[in-house]
From Swiss-Prot:
E.C. number: 3.1.26.4
Protein name (record): Ribonuclease HII
GO BP, one annotated term: DNA replication, removal of RNA primer
GO CC, alphabetical: cytoplasm; ribonuclease H2 complex
Reported function: Endonuclease that specifically degrades the RNA of RNA-DNA hybrids.
Keyword vocabulary terms for this entry: Cytoplasm, Endonuclease, Hydrolase, Manganese, Metal-binding, Nuclease
Recorded family membership: Belongs to the RNase HII family.
HAMAP family: RNase_HII_B
Coiled coil: none
Gene this protein is translated from: rnhB
UniProt organism field: Bacillus cytotoxicus (strain DSM 22905 / CIP 110041 / 391-98 / NVH 391-98)
Amino acid sequence: MGKWTIKEASELLQEIGTEEDERFQILLKDERKGIQNLISKWRKQKKKMQEEKEQFLEMSKYENALRKQGISYIAGIDEVGRGPLAGPVVTAAVILPEEFYIPGLNDSKKLSEAKRELFYDEIREKAIAIGVGIVSPQVIDEMNIYQATKRAMLDAVANLSYAPEHLLIDAMKLPTSIPQTSIVKGDAKSISISAASIIAKVTRDRMMKELGKTYPEYGFEKHMGYGTKQHLEAIETYGVLEEHRKTFAPIKDMIKNKL
């Protein structure tokens, strides 16, 4: 049998699952640099896939433990937007099916924007139910951000099309009769919370990008309402908007100093 071309070897490696495969052993003996580079790349991909699988299994332990108790509708809950000076706080509640699998799923803050958008679409397609809660800057100023976040989370749960049997919440306790588990850094420890963080993050980012079109001088589409130098300079130059949180420093001080 003649040697495979580089193109043929590349296509062959896509079919090979393990190094024990006879075809892989043949390629391994091929000393051509191009073939050895393909093998190195294949091994890296396999290693990454295995690491992602192990991470996903580790992040599924809360859900798996609840399913062993006969609980099926488990809602992961997370928020985005507690810290910004402008825009709403957005929360999401997500119920995933038992067979759900997206390798690489993680806390939304650790993912690129492109990856978040990709996962957002996949979660939307595969989830049993998704609920979103949005609380405006005006209500945040009335209630304080902690209480507003709680309200948004309860709204997200209420907006689910299926009633959850258990809540997995990122570092919060909610005033509800539904059994719940609060998990510190839950968006990196639970697939349901991670999925919720992605839904909330993409939802809020899209809202802030729209706000950026309405008020281009503020650059909302870049900083998403956080207190960057550009944002603070825009507030000084153009003033405070309805979308700003008036009880947050330094906006609170800016308003006070102008009175």
